[in-house]
Amino acid sequence: MKNYLYVFLISMVPLIELRGAIPVAYGIKAAMANPEEFSLLWAYIVIAIGNMLPVPFIFFFARRVLEWGKDKKIIWKFFTWCLEKGHKGGEKLQEKAGRGLYVALLLFVGIPLPGTGAWTGTLAASFLDMDFKKSMLAVIGGVALAGIIVGVLCTLGFGAIFGIN
């Protein structure tokens, strides 16, 4: 149970998210004396939930908090960086997507590259004032897509090295 909590918490961390938690789950399984005690399927479910849990809060509150903190003495650099990242993500989505904005959001979140996860995608959707329900569906789809891609890559890598599948 403790290992599921680890991957759950890791999946909630910005910039790491699901993309980092899935390889950790594979590593946990590889390091266990009795790997049958740790189900990768349950780990995927726990990781996806952990990755999605902060998303509604990010959509509704992150932009306000970041705007508030951008002129505060100690935190302004980090908050300004986050605001710029959200603006840039939103601009990229809008430039490349045109009318297919929600499909672009799904792909933005779903292609596992650094800085393109659920946190950044949701922040970009918030900055673009996109519809909440449609954005959440796109982000959920993107998280599922990223999970499949990272899972396949981990299965190939860890399977070849440790015999895990």
Roles of regions detected by a PLM:
Residues M1-L9, I28-L107, K133-K134, I140, ...:
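Membrane-interfacial helix-loop-helix
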Residues M12-A25, P112-L123:
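Transmembrane helix boundary and interhelical junction motifs in multipass membrane proteins
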Residues L18, V55, G147-G151:
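Hydrophobic transmembrane alpha-helices of multi-pass small-molecule transporters
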Residues G27-I28, G110, F127:
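Alpha-helical structural context
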Residues E37, L113-G115, M130:
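Transmembrane helix interruption/hinge and helix-loop junction motifs
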Residues A125-I148:
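Interfacial loop-to-transmembrane junctions
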